[in-house]
Amino acid sequence: MVVYDLLVSLSKESIDVLRFVEANLAAFNQQYIFFNIQRKNSITTPLLITPQQEKISQIVDFLMDEYNKNNRRPSGPPREQPMHPLLPYQQSPDEQPMMPYQQPPGNDDQPYEQIYHKKHASQQVNTELSDYYQHILALGDEDKGMDSTLKLPEKAKRDSDDEDGMFSIKN
């Protein structure tokens, strides 16, 4: 209601400026903060502020003053005590005191050893499989008399030759 009364009391030009401010609020906040800092820091040097920016800063100053008048805290010393005083912690008689963590009795290294051996065994199987596949590939290469590089099968070679012939340029 207070804002509505303020808007009614402002002139039409000021309302247009407020609409502009509302539309560009993020950019305006940065500019307004910058201009206020600049205005406070430069007492002797004149500022290059457009009339529209000056009106905006005046309107915002006015609105902030009105807001601060209406929402002023009651004067007096600041409250140092919290609203609800903190009660000291009291331990109930059936609550047991905190004990430091104790490891259960037994061999602590056993689970880790089991995990390590399982992981090691799976790595060993993978190594054996890769060795086996390498051996099979080597045997296949020896049987065909080919070197170890991969080559296309004969049918694939023929298909690719036909495609090349299809797009060849004939003079």
Curated annotation (Swiss-Prot):
One of its GO terms (cellular component) is virion component. It comes from African swine fever virus (isolate Tick/South Africa/Pretoriuskop Pr4/1996). The lineage of its organism: Viruses, Varidnaviria, Bamfordvirae, Nucleocytoviricota, Pokkesviricetes. Residues 141-160 have a biased composition (Basic and acidic residues). Its main location: virion. The keyword Signal does not apply. Residues 68-124, 139-171 are annotated as: Disordered. Belongs to the asfivirus H171R family. Induction: Expressed in the late phase of the viral replicative cycle. Transmembrane segments: none annotated. This is Uncharacterized protein H171R. It is found in: Virion. Keywords: Late protein, Virion. The keyword Lipid metabolism does not apply.
